[in-house]
């Protein structure tokens, strides 16, 4: 029920270890209309955890500003801020990560093999 497939851009703070990778991504999560009636994309920043062996292929894919497709499950984390508020963030526990690129002919993102 909480499975998700997400196309997103990797942010700068990629942390790779032998058995886990974690990083932030920005994903287009909708559109909104501006005062001048133009439509803009709405971006959401999401923490991603890849709890599998980090091999050379994953290291090559997880470069800042790369476009990736994530297959995984939505979860959440909570922490206490300095003002003692409890904050809940959405995170994705990734099962599969693949590089994507924009195909001009079909106007969609496609997986790079």
Residue ranges and their predicted role:
Residues 1-113:
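Single-stranded nucleic acid-binding surfaces, predominantly the OB-fold ssDNA-binding core
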């Amino acid at each position: 029920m909480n499975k998700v497939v997400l196309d997103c851009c990797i942010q700068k703070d990629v942390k790779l270890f032998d058995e886990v990778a974690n990083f932030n991504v920005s994903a287009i999560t909708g559109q909104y209309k501006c005062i001048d009636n133009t439509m803009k994309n709405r971006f959401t920043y999401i923490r991603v955890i890849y709890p599998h062996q980090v091999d050379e292929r994953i290291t090559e894919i997880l470069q800042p500003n790369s476009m990736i497709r994530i297959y995984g499950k939505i979860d959440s984390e909570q922490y206490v801020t300095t003002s003692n508020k409890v904050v809940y963030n959405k995170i994705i526990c990734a099962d599969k990560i693949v590089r994507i690129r924009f195909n001009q002919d079909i106007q969609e993102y496609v997986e790079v093999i």
